[in-house]
Amino acid sequence: MGRRAWVVFLAFSLVLTGCDQVFRNNAEPFTERRDVQFNDWEVPPDFLPMNLHVVGLGDSLTQGVGDELKKGGYFERVASDLTEWEGISFVETENLAKRGRRSDQLVEQLEKPEIQASIKDADLIFMTIGGNDIMKVLKANLFKLKTAPFYKELEGYEKRLNEIFGTVRALNPDAPIVMSGLYNPMLIITDEVKEFETIITDWNQAIETTVALDGNSCFVPVKDLFEENANVVYHTDFFHPNAQGYDLMEERYLKYLEACGVPEVLQGELDR
């Protein structure tokens, strides 16, 4: 390289070195610029929509028996309505309820690994249980009806219901449990059963107390729906609701889900 070329190269190098030094002197250390504040920016609730897994437990009411429109009773109706809630894009339902199931049979069902897996994965649980426990006593004492057998059975039912809640909570401590009360199907046959009406009221009180003690559950009363509309809400078996009866239950469930704060609980699941 010639002498002139060396001079040009040296001058060019000095210029680059000087520029680099200027940039270094003016630049903030990287460690001082790492914190970026997003405190004023909030993610909209529906920015990442939630897929909700809803599980049904219990007896024929949750199964939807008697619904001549085949719309899945109150369970599928309410589940469909949940897609309209903020932050929920899709609802997956898993109905594990079965016609005729009693509380002792539900206790046994909850011991099955596949059922436990479904409960662990649930975001929301609907349950009806107890009607068949009462019917068992009714059938056994049909021609000598007295109140004592119903209250003896109630003692066992309360213990089993507590066991059911305990099992579900051990598997899933967060999902709200929504449980309805019982109604009196005898009213459509005769109005001379005031003692039986008292029995239903006391059983409902036991259910409501258990639900309240859980702290993350919602009791939905439905007894009055069938008292006021007995001539139009029953299926032809005079025991299960028909489609209109399930429509009324749907409305009642939605009202109490809001009152119990279930949307806020589910939103909390979304935010976590």
For each predicted feature, which ranges?
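C-terminal motif of bacterial Sec signal peptides marking the signal peptidase cleavage site
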Residues: 15-18
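Active-site segments of SGNH/GDSL-like serine hydrolases
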Residues: 165-198
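Substrate-gating cap/lid alpha-helix
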Residues: 185-221
